[in-house]
Regions:
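Repeated polar recognition positions within modular binding domains
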Residues: 1, 22, 36-39, 63-65, ...
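C-terminal, non-catalytic extensions of nucleic-acid polymerases
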Residues: 33, 50-51, 71-74, 125
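Small side chains
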Residues: 111, 119-121, 138, 186, ...
Length: 229
């Protein structure tokens, strides 16, 4: 695995790190991601200007990672959701979590549990059930809560629930008002109503991250394709 910096002005690409990155987050010229080092998952901060690389946390197994206002959120192999500041302070927020997504606008973590989806306020520490039923992923798109369940995408908005797509999605992402699905036949986008569906990449992908308006696609071995959104 290699992290490569490719300038928009057409200048030659340069290698920044020999990592297989997951969960990319670009903030203030610094790239945060998870990569394996020494047999365990680590959170790494990479300065995209000078190439300096720093290990911020060694966390055993990280199933999901997000960053908001200088705080790292990690889901471990024991289904525990934890927060850790960049200064090293750590606390456990929830247990029994199979997946989570950061809603940066509302400062909320949308946590998938065996009962459905719980919204956890990262400022208030309060939790609230926002969806009951089988769920694999959950995230906000504008005012709508989107839930991926069994390959379908369900929209919850204004007290109404509707299935907007049945494409066999294996992964769900949101960028602005754009809904993105990874399916066995390709990567699709649509609007929050499930309309105006467009294929933006052919083929099947296991993993995806969005950073700086670019969708990165690949597998557990690394990202192999990028698409500008």
């Amino acid at each position: 695995g290699i992290l490569v910096k490719k300038p928009y002005n057409g200048a030659a690409a340069s290698v920044m790190a020999y990592d297989v990155p997951r969960f990319l987050h670009l903030t203030n010229g610094k790239l945060y991601y998870v990569a394996s080092e020494g047999g365990e998952d680590c959170v790494i901060r990479l300065n995209t200007q000078n190439g300096s690389r720093e290990v911020l946390a060694r966390a055993g197994v990280v199933l999901k990672f997000a960053l908001c206002d200088g705080v790292m959120y990690m889901l471990d192999a024991n289904a525990a959701l934890k927060e850790k500041t960049l200064s090293g302070e750590e606390s456990e927020l929830m247990t029994g979590v199979s997946d989570f997504t950061l809603d940066a606008v509302n400062k909320t973590l949308l946590c998938v549990t065996q009962d459905g989806v719980t919204a956890f306020g990262i400022r208030t520490g309060q939790s609230e059930s926002v969806y009951t039923g089988a769920a694999d992923q959950a995230m906000m798109c504008g005012q709508a809560l989107l839930v991926r369940s069994g390959g379908s995408v369900i929209r919850v908005m204004n007290g109404q629930m509707a299935t907007i797509r049945r494409d066999g999605a294996s992964c769900l992402l949101v960028y602005g008002q754009k809904v993105i699905e990874l399916t066995s036949s390709g990567v699709m986008t649509c609007d929050v109503n499930g309309e105006n569906a467009t294929t933006i990449a052919d083929g099947s992908f296991e993993a995806a991250s969005i950073a700086n308006g670019v969708l990165y696609l690949g597998s557990a071995s690394g990202y192999t394709k990028s698409v500008s959104l």
